[in-house]
Amino acid sequence: MDLKELENGVNPDVHWYYQSKKLPLLRAAQRALAGGKPLTIVDIGSGSGFFALELEKRFGAQIAKIYLVDTGYSEGEMTATRGAKIEKVHAIPARIENGLVVLMDVLEHLGNDLQMLQSVKAACVGDNNSFFITVPAFQSLWSGHDVFLGHYRRYQIPMLRDVLRQAGFRCISNYYLYGGLFPLVWSVRRFRNYFKREPSSNMRPLNGLVNKMLLALNALEMKVSSANTFFGVTCVGEGKI
């Protein structure tokens, strides 16, 4: 999760984008819990911890431990949570068992995305670890938003699947989110790219009614999103490590 997206006063607890984006993650966690064992959540690039905390709200007692992994945490923040159920750390835990590894919009920030995935793979023990990854989709949507957030690239399914396979990830399922918004986002960004503007985030707080409408529409789409392998604003990868 990129904290820069929150600088314009966006509240992920109500904003349609975050509230809809968490839905496929919750489904992935439900599948990971099907074995009946308490789950360890490793949220890499967690920022505010929004997505991991949503998992804790939903599944609570079924989660044994949550690691919020982010190099932006201060020593004070890490010390305050050391040994707690929800712990802030700088590095990926050395040993992950029965885990769900979450990377929400992280890989696009890395010059070497494969190296990160290989580090995750090396930390996972056994064959009962799962992953859920989101990245921005389609290079044709590249804009000042990507520049502002420090992205290296946007992905399509073959590109994401290839790097996941290279890292040794298994049972990979890929699909797109926000397919319904793709034509509008594509048109707006192509138009804006004709003009020289200071790079900035597209994320803004919205009128309450508009926010509710967008949430309702996108929450509906999320019910069938796993069938969308054609186009969207976000690309998803999930499966086993």
Residue locations for each model-derived region?
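A short His-aromatic
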Residues: 105, 109
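Conserved S-adenosyl-L-methionine
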Residues: 169-179
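Short, glycine-/aromatic-enriched active-site segment of Class I SAM-dependent methyltransferases
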Residues: 6-10, 131-153, 157-162
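Feature marks short, surface-exposed loop/turn motifs that line or immediately flank catalytic pockets
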Residues: 75, 139-141, 180
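C-terminal helical/coil "lid" or tail adjacent to the Rossmann-like core of SAM-dependent
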Residues: 182-215
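Conserved N-terminal segment of class I S-adenosyl-L-methionine
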Residues: 1-100, 104, 114-117, 203-208, ...
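A short glycine-rich, Lys/Arg-flanked "PGG" loop and its adjoining helix->strand segment in the class I
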Residues: 114-130
